[in-house]
C-alpha cells in the first residue's frame, strides 16, 4: 500500500531498489496500467519522460520536439511558437536543425524534456529519466531540469533507485 499527496509545483521522488514497483506506480498514475485497488486523483495533464530519450534519429531536434503535438493533433501556430520559445529559453534553439546523433547525452535529455513540456503538462512523471547518463552529466542535467520545472511551475514525480539523486532535487521523498 502507498499513500501520498503532491502539492502543485512540488518535486517529489520515489526512491527504491530495482523491481520494487516504482515504474509500475508511475504507469498507474499515468493511466497506462490498471490498479488492483485504491484511488488515484490527478488534477491536470500528464507528461511522461522515460529513462531513454526516445528521440527519433531521422528527425531534427525541432521535429522531435513537435512529435507530441503532432500525435495530439495540436501542432497549431500558437503551440509551435511556444516550442520555439522553450528552445530559445533553455539554450537549444541553435541546435534545432541538428539530429539526435549530433547531441551529447545531456542535450538529448533536455530535448526530450522540451518535447514533453510542449504539450503543456501540469504534472511530469520522470521514470529513471537520468540513469543512462554518467554521474557528472546527470548532476548537471538534473539541476537544469529542476530549474526548468520550477520556472515553468510544473509538478514533478520522479522515480529513481539512486538515493542521492532523489534527495538532491526533492523536498519530499517516498
Where are the language model's segments positioned?
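The feature captures the beta-strand-to-loop junction immediately N-terminal to the Walker
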Residues: 15-17
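Helix-to-loop junction immediately C-terminal to a conserved catalytic motif
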Residues: 30
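Conserved H-loop
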Residues: 153-159
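Hydrophobic anchor residue at the start of the ABC signature
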Residues: 113
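Helical segment within the ABC ATPase nucleotide-binding domain
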Residues: 138-152
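Conserved signature/switch motifs of ABC ATPase nucleotide-binding domains
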Residues: 98-101, 119
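Short helical segment in ABC ATPase nucleotide-binding domains corresponding to the A-loop/adjacent helical element
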Residues: 62-70, 80
